[in-house]
Amino acid sequence: ADDKNPLEECFREDDYEEFLEIAKNGLEGWYANLGPMRYPVKPSEEGKHDDIFAYEKFDEIVGGMDKKFWEDDGIHGGKETFCYSPMIQKPYQFQHFSEALTAPVGR
């Protein structure tokens, strides 16, 4: 059984385009697919915990990734829709998360 997490694979392979595709095609809580996984990260500030709980932190990380926002476009009867900027520019947050995921774990 292939139990690989597609989003996790995107981070491991540093594939931002695929990440956006998954995001766009799974609007029903797509980021919840990450589940309760722990990612080792290098501490960015002294004293900070050196790993994060992905499910809790994912919103925060994704928030700065792409121009993701809700809009009332008037066409879908005010239904919330995801909008993405057309420019695929791999942001720092994704790069950092991807690097952190593949970094050797050590204390």
From Swiss-Prot:
Listed EC numbers: 1.4.3.2
Binding site for substrate: 38, 49
Binding site for FAD: 35-38
Keyword Transferase belongs to the record: no
MF (Gene Ontology): L-phenylalaine oxidase activity; toxin activity
Tissue: Expressed by the venom gland.
Top-tier EC class: oxidoreductase
Listed GO CC annotations: extracellular region
One GO term (biological process): apoptotic process
Subcellular localization(s) per the UniProt record: Secreted
Keyword annotations from UniProtKB, A to Z: Antibiotic, Antimicrobial, Apoptosis, Cytolysis, Disulfide bond, FAD, Flavoprotein, Glycoprotein, Hemolysis, Hemostasis impairing toxin, Oxidoreductase, Platelet aggregation inhibiting toxin, Secreted, Toxin
Cofactor requirements of the protein: FAD
PTM annotation: N-glycosylated.
Family, per entry: Belongs to the flavin monoamine oxidase family. FIG1 subfamily.
Job description of the protein: Catalyzes an oxidative deamination of predominantly hydrophobic and aromatic L-amino acids, thus producing hydrogen peroxide that may contribute to the diverse toxic effects of this enzyme. Shows high activity on L-Met, moderate activity on L-Trp, L-Leu, L-His, L-Phe, L-Arg, L-Ile, low activity on L-Val, L-Glu, L-Lys, L-Gln, L-Asn, L-Tyr, L-Ala, and no activity on L-Asp, L-Ser, L-Pro, L-Gly, L-Thr and L-Cys. Shows antimicrobial activity inhibiting the growth of both Gram-negative and Gram-positive bacteria. Also inhibits platelet aggregation induced by ADP or collagen.
Subunit organization: Homodimer; non-covalently linked.
Name under which the protein is recorded: L-amino-acid oxidase
